[in-house]
Design a protein with these regions (language model features):
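A structural motif
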Residues: 31, 163, 212-213
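Rossmann-like NAD(P)-binding element
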Residues: 142, 165-166
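Hydrophobic faces of well-ordered beta-strands that scaffold small-molecule active sites
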Residues: 34-36, 79-81, 166, 195-197, ...
């Protein structure tokens, strides 16, 4: 949408301000919430975070995003951000410190590292990458300092941008206790804070839990919708699939998010 380059060259371009030109259009559509893919500084595609508290240079500055969020709120639209808490990019400050200081790094326990091994990047140590993607360095969410860092980042998002919700990237990879902790933390900041988790397959085990966020996305609906439309298959089959997914999560209210 913003036309930003794939690689982050560190040059600030105020592309996010283009959204101001679409405010009237969004309002005419009756949209009541905007969900943003990752907006924070990253190495490449947004899901490889460098800095959780700095808007990506390729789309603008924190001040730019504050302006966008205020304009959306003034028009009655809520703001939902993509929260990538399972992994970071290799450019993340703590991982860079490990690369430079190895065993002496104060951040070495922020990740799951074996200094007797090696990585595909020939770092001289092995670390766990998300699902074998070593450009995505898995965080050690069991470490209290990692938890505090991520929660403080969320606090900043709420305080600076007044966001209304978070979509949890790869929620199926996150420990349930972490999501429960995050939910409680966010609800203390904002009682009606919205949480949406990315789940593969059956999401009933998540959505029925009182401790977890009540809203979970499922790729089943997206995959089914795409294939029914692409193949011009009878629409009643698509409706039946959605009904089955809805029945598996009975008792959970649907969120009105456009």
């Amino acid at each position: 949408f913003c036309g930003a380059p794939h690689d982050n060259d560190g040059i600030v371009e105020h592309r996010i301000l283009r959204l101001n030109d679409f405010m009237d259009y969004f309002e005419d559509l009756g949209i009541n919430a905007i969900y943003f893919n990752p907006v924070f500084s990253s190495d490449h595609h947004g899901y490889d975070t460098r800095d959780y508290c700095k808007i990506d240079e390729r789309i603008g500055t924190n001040e730019d995003f504050i302006e966008i969020c205020k304009n959306l709120h003034d028009r009655g639209m809520r703001v939902v951000l993509d929260g990538v808490f399972n992994h970071v990019g290799r450019g993340f400050f703590a991982f860079q410190d490990v690369l430079n200081n190895r065993e002496n790094s104060q951040y070495k326990d922020w990740f799951r590292i074996d200094f007797n091994g090696n990585s595909p990047y020939d770092d001289g140590f092995y670390y766990e990458g998300w699902e074998g993607h070593y450009e995505l360095v898995k965080l050690n969410l069991d470490h209290p300092d990692v938890q505090n860092y991520l929660l403080s980042a969320v606090d900043y998002w709420i305080d600076a941008f007044d966001i209304d919700g978070i979509r949890l990237d790869v929620a199926y990879s996150l420990p349930r206790w972490f999501m429960a902790m995050l939910k409680d933390h966010c609800r203390q900041k904002k009682a009606d804070f919205f949480l949406l988790g990315e789940v593969l397959g059956d999401n009933a085990g998540y959505s029925r839990s009182e401790k977890l966020p009540k809203s979970f996305s499922t790729r089943d609906i997206r995959y089914t919708s795409y294939n029914r439309i692409r193949t011009h298959t009878r629409p009643e089959r698509h409706i039946n699939t959605i009904y089955m997914i809805h029945q598996s999560s009975r008792g959970v209210k649907s969120a009105r998010l456009v």
